[in-house]
Amino acid sequence: MKVQSETQGLSGSDYPSAVQRIALTLVICTFHREEFVLRNLSGLEEAGVLGDHIEVLVIDNSSGESLSAKLAGMAHVRVIPQGNLGGAGGFTRGIYEAMKAACGTGSTEACEPYVLLMDDDIEFDPEVVRRTLDLLANGGEKLCIAGQLYNIHPPHDLFEAGATFGERKPFDWKPYLKPTCCSASLKAGQNEIDYGGWWYFCFPLKAVGQVGLPLPIFIRGDDVDYGRRWVDAGYRIISPDGIGVRHETFDARYTTWIYYYETRNALICLATSYKFRGWGMAVIWKHLEYNIGKDLGRFDYGRAAVKLEGIRDFLRGAESLDECEARHREITALYAAHSLQNVPDDEATRVMIDLERPPRFSLAGRLKSIALKALRPLSCIWASEKHVALHGKVFTSKHLPFNTRSVLFCHTPSGKKYFFRHSADQEKRFLKELSQMRRQWADGFGTAEKAWQEAVPRLTSFDHWEQIFASLDASQKGN
């Protein structure tokens, strides 16, 4: 969608002058991306945005001292090193520290305190922070702001302006692409946005006691759940023109082990904050089985393996969230064990398919493909084996020729190449595991769903997160 840039087209007069004073804590969660953090904070400092009522908390999940040393001389900036708790743990640490600071100083009496969550690797104009402050000062107390997301690469098209989840089908992350001006956003009555991405998400600190802290689910889905809980508490999420950032879009990388978190956390959301969507056990399983079947069809056995682990951990309940760093290492190792590390240098000899301009099949060709698949495995004996090179943003098996035996996927946004080869043994093993999981799902879904619903108040409580941070800090000091 081609629209104006994240700041273009709105003058200061489009945003009303502040009525009440706002105290803003910017929380940046980072992991080995010092250059991005230094660039963005320098921009805020040079623009004169930071001050007594606008401060920054940088949560460094790499637990090192380098970033702290580099930012030691910057006023109104505090760095908190900690172990890797993912984006969920990093951003929650920032909210937790902001709550402690507000309670300790009593500054909430003079200003309305807000928290602004920001990714470490975004690009933005400091003016968007000023506009956010003006909007908060005039928009009422029951308001959250989701910054619009623009592609960091030219021509910087709009990618998302808030989003919904589970609306059309269970696993459905739908970007909202109806940007509105500031005044229209404030006047709108019905909330059409479920959540805002944590590249830029702002909310009132005082209401965290009512809404709770985010779920400790490491990455992927933490913002999906948290945004919906704000909506359920009576808050509106708006994403007006003029408040946006530039960031890599989700198709800029080929996703591997992260599908463990996407699967597990989506199931947690469907069982708790998005239970109202009404997706039942059978429908959810149908989509899970279909998606894993697609992974097997493109020979990505690593992705199938981590998705099955995600389902298994959902059925285990909240105890699966314990020892998240150790579990993260296990999941990345699991994907690596099923991936092919050596990419062959034979692209020129392969059947080339451009996924941006996929081949069109005639009716006769489609009928032939259906017949060949129906006659398996007999048809595989006489049909020649195919070795394919796919070029595109998203790896799909939809356009693979019959009897494809290996795929070299060239991910055009990143320039990286991934190799996948058919394995009859792996396919048989995962189909058997999928069949076993189907029975476990039928037996355990109801119990797991209820257990997650009962666990959410504890998992999102101040006390629970305080225990997590205390344990993590103690282990760091011990090392």
Residue ranges and their predicted role:
Residues 1, 264-479:
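Terminal low-complexity segments of carbohydrate-biosynthetic enzymes
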Residues 1-42, 477-479:
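N-proximal low-complexity "stem/linker" segments adjacent to membrane-targeting elements
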Residues 43-80:
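Acidic donor-binding segment of Leloir-type glycosyltransferases
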Residues 72-89, 97, 105:
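Conserved donor nucleotide-binding strand/loop of the catalytic core
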Residues 109-123:
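Short beta-strand-to-loop acidic/aromatic patch adjacent to the donor-nucleotide binding site
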Residues 123, 127-170:
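Conserved donor NDP-sugar-binding/catalytic core segment of glycosyltransferases
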Residues 176-200:
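A recurrent flexible, glycine/aromatic-enriched loop bordering the glycosyltransferase active site
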Residues 198-200, 209-228, 234-240, 257:
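Donor nucleotide-sugar recognition loop
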